Amino acid sequence: MESLRSLSNISALHELLCRYSNLSGTLTWNLSSTNGTHNLTTANWPPWNLNCTPILDRKKPSPSDLNLWVRIVMYSVIFLLSVFGNTLIIIVLVMNKRLRTITNSFLLSLALSDLMVAVLCMPFTLIPNLMENFIFGEVICRAAAYFMGLSVSVSTFNLVAISIERYSAICNPLKSRVWQTRSHAYRVIAATWVLSSIIMIPYLVYNKTVTFPMKDRRVGHQCRLVWPSKQVQQAWYVLLLTILFFIPGVVMIVAYGLISRELYRGIQFEMDLNKEAKAHKNGVSTPTTIPSGDEGDGCYIQVTKRRNTMEMSTLTPSVCTKMDRARINNSEAKLMAKKRVIRMLIVIVAMFFICWMPIFVANTWKAFDELSAFNTLTGAPISFIHLLSYTSACVNPLIYCFMNKRFRKAFLGTFSSCIKPCRNFRDTDEDIAATGASLSKFSYTTVSSLGPA
Protein backbone atom coordinates (compact mmCIF):
# COMPACT_ATOMS: atom_id res chain seq x y z
CA MET A 1 0.00 0.00 0.00
CA GLU A 2 2.81 2.38 0.92
CA SER A 3 4.61 1.51 -2.28
CA LEU A 4 1.52 2.46 -4.31
CA ARG A 5 1.33 5.83 -2.54
CA SER A 6 5.00 6.44 -3.24
CA LEU A 7 4.52 5.63 -6.89
CA SER A 8 1.51 7.96 -7.03
CA ASN A 9 3.47 10.83 -5.44
CA ILE A 10 6.40 10.28 -7.79
CA SER A 11 4.06 10.28 -10.78
CA ALA A 12 2.44 13.53 -9.64
CA LEU A 13 5.83 15.16 -9.10
CA HIS A 14 7.00 13.89 -12.48
CA GLU A 15 3.98 15.44 -14.19
CA LEU A 16 4.38 18.75 -12.34
CA LEU A 17 8.06 19.06 -13.30
CA CYS A 18 7.27 18.22 -16.91
CA ARG A 19 4.61 20.91 -17.03
CA TYR A 20 6.93 23.57 -15.64
CA SER A 21 9.67 22.52 -18.02
CA ASN A 22 7.42 23.41 -20.97
CA LEU A 23 5.81 26.67 -19.87
CA SER A 24 8.07 28.73 -22.10
CA GLY A 25 7.00 30.44 -25.26
CA THR A 26 3.27 30.21 -24.69
CA LEU A 27 2.27 33.66 -23.54
CA THR A 28 2.71 37.30 -24.50
CA TRP A 29 2.70 39.45 -21.39
CA ASN A 30 4.19 42.89 -21.54
CA LEU A 31 2.63 45.83 -23.36
CA SER A 32 5.73 45.97 -25.48
CA SER A 33 6.90 42.37 -25.07
CA THR A 34 6.53 40.01 -27.96
CA ASN A 35 6.93 36.55 -26.46
CA GLY A 36 6.97 36.53 -22.66
CA THR A 37 7.61 33.62 -20.33
CA HIS A 38 7.25 32.67 -16.71
CA ASN A 39 10.03 33.31 -14.19
CA LEU A 40 10.20 29.65 -13.22
CA THR A 41 11.53 28.73 -16.64
CA THR A 42 15.28 28.90 -17.35
CA ALA A 43 17.46 27.60 -20.11
CA ASN A 44 18.68 24.70 -17.95
CA TRP A 45 15.36 23.77 -16.36
CA PRO A 46 14.87 21.02 -15.29
CA PRO A 47 18.42 20.09 -14.16
CA TRP A 48 17.80 16.39 -14.81
CA ASN A 49 16.40 14.42 -17.72
CA LEU A 50 12.69 13.67 -17.78
CA ASN A 51 10.72 11.75 -20.33
CA CYS A 52 7.81 14.17 -20.63
CA THR A 53 6.46 13.33 -24.06
CA PRO A 54 3.65 11.00 -22.94
CA ILE A 55 2.45 13.45 -20.29
CA LEU A 56 2.50 16.42 -22.65
CA ASP A 57 0.61 14.48 -25.29
CA ARG A 58 -2.00 13.52 -22.73
CA LYS A 59 -2.33 16.70 -20.62
CA LYS A 60 -1.45 19.60 -22.93
CA PRO A 61 -3.02 19.27 -26.38
CA SER A 62 -2.04 21.79 -29.06
CA PRO A 63 -4.53 24.56 -29.98
CA SER A 64 -7.16 23.57 -32.48
CA ASP A 65 -6.88 24.68 -36.07
CA LEU A 66 -10.10 26.67 -35.66
CA ASN A 67 -8.70 28.68 -32.76
CA LEU A 68 -5.52 29.31 -34.71
CA TRP A 69 -7.32 30.58 -37.80
CA VAL A 70 -9.70 32.74 -35.78
CA ARG A 71 -6.74 34.53 -34.20
CA ILE A 72 -5.03 34.98 -37.56
CA VAL A 73 -8.18 36.34 -39.22
CA MET A 74 -8.99 38.75 -36.37
CA TYR A 75 -5.44 40.11 -36.21
CA SER A 76 -5.35 40.45 -40.01
CA VAL A 77 -8.64 42.35 -40.15
CA ILE A 78 -7.62 44.77 -37.39
CA PHE A 79 -4.20 45.21 -38.99
CA LEU A 80 -5.60 46.00 -42.45
CA LEU A 81 -8.26 48.38 -41.13
CA SER A 82 -5.70 50.22 -39.00
CA VAL A 83 -3.15 50.59 -41.79
CA PHE A 84 -5.75 51.53 -44.41
CA GLY A 85 -7.71 53.97 -42.23
CA ASN A 86 -4.74 55.81 -40.74
CA THR A 87 -2.94 56.00 -44.08
CA LEU A 88 -6.00 57.62 -45.66
CA ILE A 89 -6.21 60.14 -42.82
CA ILE A 90 -2.56 61.09 -43.22
CA ILE A 91 -2.94 61.55 -46.99
CA VAL A 92 -6.12 63.64 -46.70
CA LEU A 93 -4.80 65.90 -43.93
CA VAL A 94 -1.47 66.47 -45.68
CA MET A 95 -2.91 67.14 -49.15
CA ASN A 96 -5.93 69.24 -48.14
CA LYS A 97 -4.95 72.74 -47.00
CA ARG A 98 -8.46 73.53 -45.76
CA LEU A 99 -8.10 70.85 -43.09
CA ARG A 100 -4.80 72.10 -41.68
CA THR A 101 -6.25 73.30 -38.38
CA ILE A 102 -5.16 73.10 -34.76
CA THR A 103 -7.10 69.98 -33.82
CA ASN A 104 -6.31 68.30 -37.11
CA SER A 105 -2.62 68.69 -36.28
CA PHE A 106 -3.24 66.47 -33.25
CA LEU A 107 -5.28 64.08 -35.40
CA LEU A 108 -2.38 63.79 -37.83
CA SER A 109 -0.04 62.92 -34.96
CA LEU A 110 -2.63 60.44 -33.66
CA ALA A 111 -2.87 58.78 -37.08
CA LEU A 112 0.92 58.43 -37.26
CA SER A 113 1.12 56.85 -33.81
CA ASP A 114 -1.81 54.51 -34.55
CA LEU A 115 -0.12 53.47 -37.78
CA MET A 116 3.00 52.65 -35.76
CA VAL A 117 0.88 50.58 -33.37
CA ALA A 118 -0.45 48.52 -36.28
CA VAL A 119 2.86 48.08 -38.11
CA LEU A 120 5.21 47.62 -35.15
CA CYS A 121 3.02 45.96 -32.51
CA MET A 122 0.72 43.51 -34.23
CA PRO A 123 3.16 41.48 -36.40
CA PHE A 124 5.72 41.13 -33.62
CA THR A 125 2.99 40.00 -31.24
CA LEU A 126 1.09 37.57 -33.47
CA ILE A 127 3.98 35.80 -35.24
CA PRO A 128 5.97 34.81 -32.11
CA ASN A 129 2.77 33.64 -30.43
CA LEU A 130 1.85 31.43 -33.36
CA MET A 131 5.39 30.04 -33.70
CA GLU A 132 6.01 29.96 -29.93
CA ASN A 133 9.45 31.30 -30.77
CA PHE A 134 10.92 34.77 -31.39
CA ILE A 135 12.90 34.51 -34.62
CA PHE A 136 13.81 38.15 -35.28
CA GLY A 137 16.97 38.50 -33.18
CA GLU A 138 18.27 40.73 -30.38
CA VAL A 139 18.24 44.05 -32.29
CA ILE A 140 14.64 43.68 -33.47
CA CYS A 141 13.66 42.55 -29.98
CA ARG A 142 14.87 45.80 -28.40
CA ALA A 143 13.78 48.09 -31.25
CA ALA A 144 10.31 46.58 -31.65
CA ALA A 145 9.62 46.74 -27.93
CA TYR A 146 10.77 50.36 -27.74
CA PHE A 147 8.69 51.55 -30.71
CA MET A 148 5.68 49.61 -29.44
CA GLY A 149 5.77 51.50 -26.17
CA LEU A 150 6.51 54.78 -27.96
CA SER A 151 3.54 54.49 -30.31
CA VAL A 152 1.12 53.56 -27.52
CA SER A 153 2.34 56.45 -25.36
CA VAL A 154 2.11 59.02 -28.17
CA SER A 155 -1.37 57.81 -29.11
CA THR A 156 -2.59 58.20 -25.53
CA PHE A 157 -1.05 61.65 -25.07
CA ASN A 158 -2.61 62.79 -28.36
CA LEU A 159 -6.06 61.72 -27.17
CA VAL A 160 -5.53 63.76 -24.00
CA ALA A 161 -4.36 66.80 -25.99
CA ILE A 162 -7.41 66.61 -28.27
CA SER A 163 -9.79 66.48 -25.29
CA ILE A 164 -8.12 69.50 -23.65
CA GLU A 165 -8.13 71.47 -26.90
CA ARG A 166 -11.81 70.78 -27.47
CA TYR A 167 -12.68 71.71 -23.90
CA SER A 168 -10.85 75.04 -24.20
CA ALA A 169 -12.44 75.85 -27.56
CA ILE A 170 -15.99 75.24 -26.32
CA CYS A 171 -15.98 76.15 -22.64
CA ASN A 172 -13.40 78.98 -22.70
CA PRO A 173 -13.42 80.23 -26.31
CA LEU A 174 -12.16 83.77 -25.71
CA LYS A 175 -9.26 82.72 -23.49
CA SER A 176 -8.32 79.82 -25.74
CA ARG A 177 -7.85 82.08 -28.77
CA VAL A 178 -4.81 83.62 -27.10
CA TRP A 179 -2.81 80.39 -27.03
CA GLN A 180 -4.59 78.05 -29.45
CA THR A 181 -2.38 78.52 -32.49
CA ARG A 182 -0.84 76.04 -34.88
CA SER A 183 2.65 76.84 -33.64
CA HIS A 184 1.53 76.04 -30.09
CA ALA A 185 -0.05 72.78 -31.32
CA TYR A 186 3.20 71.81 -33.04
CA ARG A 187 5.14 72.41 -29.83
CA VAL A 188 2.70 70.26 -27.84
CA ILE A 189 2.92 67.47 -30.41
CA ALA A 190 6.72 67.60 -30.37
CA ALA A 191 6.64 67.47 -26.56
CA THR A 192 4.44 64.35 -26.59
CA TRP A 193 6.87 62.53 -28.89
CA VAL A 194 9.95 63.59 -26.92
CA LEU A 195 8.34 62.72 -23.57
CA SER A 196 7.21 59.34 -24.86
CA SER A 197 10.69 58.64 -26.23
CA ILE A 198 12.20 59.29 -22.80
CA ILE A 199 9.59 57.31 -20.86
CA MET A 200 10.10 54.19 -22.98
CA ILE A 201 13.91 54.03 -22.63
CA PRO A 202 13.67 51.07 -20.17
CA TYR A 203 12.47 48.93 -23.08
CA LEU A 204 15.79 49.54 -24.83
CA VAL A 205 17.76 48.74 -21.69
CA TYR A 206 15.97 45.74 -20.21
CA ASN A 207 14.42 44.00 -23.22
CA LYS A 208 16.46 40.94 -24.21
CA THR A 209 16.18 37.62 -26.00
CA VAL A 210 16.17 34.65 -23.62
CA THR A 211 16.66 31.03 -24.68
CA PHE A 212 14.49 28.11 -23.58
CA PRO A 213 14.17 24.41 -24.52
CA MET A 214 11.34 23.72 -26.95
CA LYS A 215 9.23 20.56 -27.05
CA ASP A 216 11.11 19.15 -30.05
CA ARG A 217 14.44 19.60 -28.21
CA ARG A 218 15.33 22.69 -30.23
CA VAL A 219 16.44 25.94 -28.56
CA GLY A 220 13.79 28.65 -28.71
CA HIS A 221 14.00 32.37 -28.03
CA GLN A 222 11.77 34.80 -26.20
CA CYS A 223 11.84 38.59 -26.37
CA ARG A 224 11.09 39.71 -22.84
CA LEU A 225 11.84 42.30 -20.19
CA VAL A 226 14.49 41.14 -17.72
CA TRP A 227 14.22 43.41 -14.69
CA PRO A 228 17.01 43.79 -12.10
CA SER A 229 14.50 43.14 -9.30
CA LYS A 230 10.85 42.43 -8.64
CA GLN A 231 10.40 45.87 -7.08
CA VAL A 232 11.62 47.61 -10.24
CA GLN A 233 9.20 45.56 -12.34
CA GLN A 234 6.27 46.44 -10.09
CA ALA A 235 7.20 50.14 -10.02
CA TRP A 236 7.38 50.19 -13.83
CA TYR A 237 3.93 48.77 -14.41
CA VAL A 238 2.38 50.99 -11.74
CA LEU A 239 3.99 53.96 -13.50
CA LEU A 240 2.56 52.91 -16.87
CA LEU A 241 -0.86 52.32 -15.33
CA THR A 242 -0.79 55.82 -13.85
CA ILE A 243 0.57 57.97 -16.69
CA LEU A 244 -0.85 56.05 -19.67
CA PHE A 245 -4.24 54.97 -18.36
CA PHE A 246 -5.43 56.43 -15.07
CA ILE A 247 -4.47 60.10 -15.57
CA PRO A 248 -5.46 60.22 -19.28
CA GLY A 249 -8.76 58.53 -18.48
CA VAL A 250 -9.59 61.03 -15.73
CA VAL A 251 -8.63 64.00 -17.94
CA MET A 252 -10.82 62.76 -20.80
CA ILE A 253 -13.78 62.09 -18.51
CA VAL A 254 -13.57 65.58 -16.97
CA ALA A 255 -12.99 67.39 -20.27
CA TYR A 256 -15.72 65.64 -22.24
CA GLY A 257 -18.05 65.78 -19.25
CA LEU A 258 -17.74 69.57 -19.11
CA ILE A 259 -18.19 69.77 -22.88
CA SER A 260 -21.36 67.67 -22.65
CA ARG A 261 -22.68 69.96 -19.91
CA GLU A 262 -22.02 73.01 -22.09
CA LEU A 263 -23.72 71.38 -25.06
CA TYR A 264 -26.69 70.47 -22.88
CA ARG A 265 -27.03 74.14 -21.97
CA GLY A 266 -26.96 74.89 -25.68
CA ILE A 267 -29.74 72.37 -26.22
CA GLN A 268 -31.85 74.13 -23.61
CA PHE A 269 -31.11 77.44 -25.32
CA GLU A 270 -32.22 76.11 -28.71
CA MET A 271 -35.40 74.67 -27.20
CA ASP A 272 -36.24 78.05 -25.68
CA LEU A 273 -35.70 79.68 -29.07
CA ASN A 274 -38.09 77.19 -30.66
CA LYS A 275 -40.74 77.93 -28.05
CA GLU A 276 -40.29 81.66 -28.55
CA ALA A 277 -40.56 81.33 -32.34
CA LYS A 278 -43.72 79.24 -32.13
CA ALA A 279 -45.27 81.60 -29.60
CA HIS A 280 -44.48 84.57 -31.84
CA LYS A 281 -46.88 83.22 -34.44
CA ASN A 282 -49.68 83.96 -32.01
CA GLY A 283 -48.25 87.36 -31.05
CA VAL A 284 -47.37 86.22 -27.52
CA SER A 285 -44.40 87.68 -25.66
CA THR A 286 -42.30 84.92 -24.06
CA PRO A 287 -39.20 84.96 -21.87
CA THR A 288 -36.17 83.87 -23.88
CA THR A 289 -33.14 82.24 -22.33
CA ILE A 290 -29.97 83.91 -23.57
CA PRO A 291 -26.41 83.77 -22.42
CA SER A 292 -25.37 86.37 -19.91
CA GLY A 293 -22.67 88.87 -20.63
CA ASP A 294 -20.21 87.00 -18.42
CA GLU A 295 -18.24 84.69 -20.68
CA GLY A 296 -16.41 83.08 -17.80
CA ASP A 297 -19.14 81.37 -15.78
CA GLY A 298 -21.40 80.11 -18.54
CA CYS A 299 -24.53 81.21 -16.66
CA TYR A 300 -27.83 82.05 -18.28
CA ILE A 301 -30.41 84.66 -17.37
CA GLN A 302 -34.05 85.15 -18.22
CA VAL A 303 -34.75 88.25 -20.30
CA THR A 304 -38.20 89.22 -21.47
CA LYS A 305 -38.05 89.96 -25.15
CA ARG A 306 -40.96 91.73 -26.90
CA ARG A 307 -41.13 92.08 -30.64
CA ASN A 308 -41.46 95.56 -32.11
CA THR A 309 -44.92 95.49 -33.65
CA MET A 310 -44.18 98.46 -35.90
CA GLU A 311 -41.08 96.72 -37.27
CA MET A 312 -42.87 93.42 -37.79
CA SER A 313 -45.83 95.09 -39.47
CA THR A 314 -43.67 95.93 -42.46
CA LEU A 315 -43.34 92.21 -43.23
CA THR A 316 -46.09 90.30 -44.95
CA PRO A 317 -47.59 87.27 -43.17
CA SER A 318 -46.16 84.89 -45.77
CA VAL A 319 -42.64 86.27 -45.30
CA CYS A 320 -42.95 86.01 -41.52
CA THR A 321 -44.19 82.44 -41.79
CA LYS A 322 -41.27 81.43 -44.01
CA MET A 323 -38.76 83.11 -41.71
CA ASP A 324 -40.21 81.42 -38.64
CA ARG A 325 -40.28 78.03 -40.36
CA ALA A 326 -36.67 78.36 -41.50
CA ARG A 327 -35.62 79.48 -38.05
CA ILE A 328 -37.34 76.53 -36.38
CA ASN A 329 -35.88 74.02 -38.86
CA ASN A 330 -32.38 75.44 -38.42
CA SER A 331 -32.73 75.36 -34.66
CA GLU A 332 -33.94 71.75 -34.70
CA ALA A 333 -30.99 70.74 -36.89
CA LYS A 334 -28.58 72.31 -34.41
CA LEU A 335 -30.39 70.53 -31.60
CA MET A 336 -29.96 67.12 -33.23
CA ALA A 337 -26.30 67.86 -34.00
CA LYS A 338 -25.57 68.66 -30.35
CA LYS A 339 -27.21 65.43 -29.22
CA ARG A 340 -25.05 63.48 -31.67
CA VAL A 341 -21.99 65.23 -30.28
CA ILE A 342 -22.82 64.17 -26.72
CA ARG A 343 -23.31 60.57 -27.83
CA MET A 344 -19.99 60.64 -29.69
CA LEU A 345 -18.15 61.98 -26.64
CA ILE A 346 -19.56 59.11 -24.58
CA VAL A 347 -18.33 56.66 -27.23
CA ILE A 348 -14.83 58.20 -27.17
CA VAL A 349 -14.44 57.76 -23.41
CA ALA A 350 -16.02 54.29 -23.42
CA MET A 351 -13.75 53.02 -26.22
CA PHE A 352 -10.64 54.30 -24.45
CA PHE A 353 -11.46 52.30 -21.33
CA ILE A 354 -12.67 49.22 -23.23
CA CYS A 355 -9.53 49.03 -25.38
CA TRP A 356 -6.85 49.85 -22.82
CA MET A 357 -8.06 48.85 -19.36
CA PRO A 358 -7.65 45.05 -19.84
CA ILE A 359 -4.00 45.21 -20.96
CA PHE A 360 -2.93 47.59 -18.20
CA VAL A 361 -4.74 45.52 -15.57
CA ALA A 362 -3.17 42.31 -16.92
CA ASN A 363 0.33 43.79 -16.90
CA THR A 364 -0.04 45.11 -13.35
CA TRP A 365 -1.52 41.82 -12.18
CA LYS A 366 1.39 39.94 -13.73
CA ALA A 367 3.92 42.20 -12.00
CA PHE A 368 2.49 41.50 -8.53
CA ASP A 369 1.27 37.89 -8.89
CA GLU A 370 2.84 36.32 -11.95
CA LEU A 371 1.86 32.70 -11.30
CA SER A 372 -1.82 33.48 -10.73
CA ALA A 373 -2.00 35.75 -13.77
CA PHE A 374 -0.18 33.17 -15.88
CA ASN A 375 -2.60 30.39 -14.97
CA THR A 376 -5.63 32.60 -15.62
CA LEU A 377 -4.66 34.39 -18.82
CA THR A 378 -2.62 31.80 -20.71
CA GLY A 379 -3.60 31.29 -24.34
CA ALA A 380 -6.74 32.85 -25.81
CA PRO A 381 -7.46 35.39 -23.01
CA ILE A 382 -4.14 37.23 -23.32
CA SER A 383 -4.34 37.13 -27.13
CA PHE A 384 -7.81 38.68 -26.99
CA ILE A 385 -6.61 41.34 -24.52
CA HIS A 386 -3.78 42.36 -26.85
CA LEU A 387 -6.13 42.37 -29.83
CA LEU A 388 -8.54 44.60 -27.91
CA SER A 389 -5.80 47.15 -27.26
CA TYR A 390 -4.83 47.14 -30.94
CA THR A 391 -8.46 47.75 -31.90
CA SER A 392 -8.06 51.37 -30.81
CA ALA A 393 -5.76 51.92 -33.80
CA CYS A 394 -8.64 51.26 -36.22
CA VAL A 395 -11.40 52.76 -34.05
CA ASN A 396 -9.76 56.18 -33.66
CA PRO A 397 -9.92 57.00 -37.40
CA LEU A 398 -13.63 56.16 -37.46
CA ILE A 399 -14.50 58.26 -34.40
CA TYR A 400 -12.33 61.29 -34.98
CA CYS A 401 -12.33 61.61 -38.78
CA PHE A 402 -14.69 59.46 -40.82
CA MET A 403 -17.68 60.47 -38.65
CA ASN A 404 -16.95 64.08 -39.68
CA LYS A 405 -18.91 65.23 -42.71
CA ARG A 406 -16.27 67.73 -43.76
CA PHE A 407 -13.53 65.11 -43.61
CA ARG A 408 -15.61 62.72 -45.71
CA LYS A 409 -16.05 65.42 -48.33
CA ALA A 410 -12.33 66.17 -48.25
CA PHE A 411 -11.64 62.47 -48.66
CA LEU A 412 -13.86 62.28 -51.74
CA GLY A 413 -12.35 65.50 -53.08
CA THR A 414 -8.86 64.06 -52.70
CA PHE A 415 -9.45 60.64 -54.26
CA SER A 416 -12.28 61.40 -56.70
CA SER A 417 -10.85 64.10 -58.93
CA CYS A 418 -13.46 63.40 -61.58
CA ILE A 419 -16.33 64.47 -59.32
CA LYS A 420 -16.43 68.25 -59.13
CA PRO A 421 -18.97 68.58 -56.31
CA CYS A 422 -16.62 66.62 -54.09
CA ARG A 423 -13.75 68.97 -54.84
CA ASN A 424 -15.65 72.22 -54.27
CA PHE A 425 -17.37 71.57 -51.00
CA ARG A 426 -18.42 74.16 -48.50
CA ASP A 427 -18.53 74.15 -44.73
CA THR A 428 -21.72 73.03 -43.03
CA ASP A 429 -23.19 73.43 -39.56
CA GLU A 430 -22.38 69.82 -38.76
CA ASP A 431 -18.60 70.00 -39.13
CA ILE A 432 -16.44 68.63 -36.34
CA ALA A 433 -14.35 70.67 -33.94
CA ALA A 434 -11.38 69.22 -35.79
CA THR A 435 -12.19 71.70 -38.55
CA GLY A 436 -10.92 74.45 -36.31
CA ALA A 437 -14.20 76.30 -35.86
CA SER A 438 -14.19 78.90 -33.13
CA LEU A 439 -16.69 77.62 -30.62
CA SER A 440 -18.45 79.97 -28.27
CA LYS A 441 -21.28 79.93 -25.79
CA PHE A 442 -22.74 82.88 -27.68
CA SER A 443 -22.63 81.09 -31.04
CA TYR A 444 -24.03 77.62 -30.57
CA THR A 445 -24.21 77.12 -34.32
CA THR A 446 -20.52 76.15 -34.37
CA VAL A 447 -20.77 73.75 -31.46
CA SER A 448 -22.37 71.21 -33.74
CA SER A 449 -19.11 71.03 -35.64
CA LEU A 450 -17.85 68.67 -32.96
CA GLY A 451 -20.13 65.88 -33.91
CA PRO A 452 -20.43 63.32 -36.59
CA ALA A 453 -22.54 63.91 -39.61
From Swiss-Prot:
GO terms for cellular component: plasma membrane. Residues 95-104, 165-184, 262-343, 404-453 are cytoplasmic. It comes from the Eukaryota. Disulfide bonds join C141-C223. Pfam families: 7tm_1. Residues 1-64, 132-142, 206-237, 365-379 are extracellular. One of its GO terms (molecular function) is neuropeptide receptor activity. Receptor for cholecystokinin. This receptor mediates its action by association with G proteins that activate a phosphatidylinositol-calcium second messenger system. Has high affinity for CCK-8 and low affinities for gastrin-17-I, CCK-4, and unsulfated CCK-8. PANTHER family: G-PROTEIN COUPLED RECEPTOR, GASTRIN_CHOLECYSTOKININ TYPE B RECEPTOR. This is Cholecystokinin receptor. It comes from Xenopus laevis.
